[in-house]
């Protein structure tokens, strides 16, 4: 543990930009997103869902927490953290993650063969285990139009086989436009939810939660004015809150302060502006 963490009684860095489910903060909107995704999966008759959000809004950590809570006795979940592939490559990864040998999948037959293998997988899961196949694709804005068109065909399988396939698309806002340009797929999206940034009244609880997970047992580490400035500068984007809070924490520790105050946050913000390290959207006055 480095010195500035020890200074504040922390076991680990509370503001690392990682998708560690322990640090998930269940804001009102994040709870709503998970409730809607759970409904989508549990219904087993709504074949496509779409969760979007700006970069840094917490989509990937929401995905991890959501899939961890799915009832695996009823559902078989396959997650792909990157969707920047062709349809054939994506479905091959789904099959490999489902336990099939890549050599057995083969390279001949293209999409038709992959559809056959997916049909067999979904049918086997339903008949032998009573489970539904759930495919979760993160960074889905990177899917090319052909892959999106092919994904739509998966919903057709639900009327043809003794199995069910639900696909959850997770991505940045441009995913919505990409889907809208393909009406046959757009019409199959049964659930849509856009994950907004944190509300102003949630910033303090967000920081406190992450600090407590990291080992903080004392009182509030960021004073009220510091929290307010962090929120205004970052516009409530969780990833940017983490970045500014981490730097402010380090600055406070270097000065042997017992808490992080507004002045310490201002120092970091001015330094970031001077080096043009704040996102363009946050470059104005706080």
Regions of interest found by a model, annotated:
Residues 1-45, 278-286:
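A short, basic N-terminal segment
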Residues 5, 86-89, 101-150, 159-162, ...:
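Mid-core helix/loop region of P-loop NTP-binding domains shared across ATPases and GTPases
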Residues 10-17, 74-75, 85-105:
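Conserved NTP-binding/hydrolysis module of P-loop NTPases
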Residues 43-65:
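Walker A/P-loop nucleotide-binding motif
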Residues 66-70, 173-188:
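Short regulatory helix/loop adjacent to the ATP-binding pocket of P-loop NTPases
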Residues 80-84, 179, 190-203:
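Conserved AAA+ ATPase "SRH/arginine-finger" region at the nucleotide-binding site
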Residues 96-98, 172-173, 198-217:
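Conserved AAA+ ATPase "sensor/coupling" helix adjacent to the nucleotide-binding pocket
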Residues 104, 177, 212-286:
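C-terminal alpha-helical "lid" subdomain
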């Amino acid at each position: 543990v480095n010195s500035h963490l020890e200074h504040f009684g922390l076991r680990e860095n509370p503001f690392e930009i990682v998708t560690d489910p322990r640090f998930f903060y269940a804001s009102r909107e994040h709870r709503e997103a998970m409730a809607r995704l759970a409904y989508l999966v549990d219904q087993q008759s709504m074949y496509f869902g779409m969760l979007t959000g700006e970069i840094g809004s917490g989509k990937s950590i929401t995905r991890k927490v959501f899939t961890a809570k799915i009832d695996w006795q009823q559902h078989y979940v396959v997650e792909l953290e990157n969707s920047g592939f062709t349809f054939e490559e994506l479905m091959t990864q789904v099959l490999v993650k489902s336990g099939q040998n890549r050599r057995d999948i083969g390279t001949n037959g293209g999409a038709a063969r992959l559809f056959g293998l997916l049909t067999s997988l979904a049918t086997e899961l339903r008949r032998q285990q009573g489970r539904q196949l759930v495919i979760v694709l993160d960074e889905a804005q990177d899917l090319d139009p052909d892959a999106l068109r092919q994904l739509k065909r998966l919903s057709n399988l639900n009327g043809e086989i003794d199995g069910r396939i639900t696909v959850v698309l997770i991505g940045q806002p441009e995913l919505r436009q990409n889907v809208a340009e393909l009406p046959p797929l757009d019409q199959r999206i049964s659930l849509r939810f856009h994950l907004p940034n944190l509300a102003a009244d949630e910033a303090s609880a967000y920081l406190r939660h992450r600090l407590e997970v990291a080992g903080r047992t004392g009182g509030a580490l960021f004073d009220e004015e510091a929290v307010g400035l962090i929120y205004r500068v970052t516009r409530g984007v969780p990833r940017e809150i983490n970045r500014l809070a981490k730097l402010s924490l380090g600055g406070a520790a270097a000065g042997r302060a017992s808490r992080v105050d507004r002045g310490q946050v201002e120092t970091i913000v001015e330094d970031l502006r001077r080096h043009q390290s704040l996102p363009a959207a946050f470059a104005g006055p706080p």
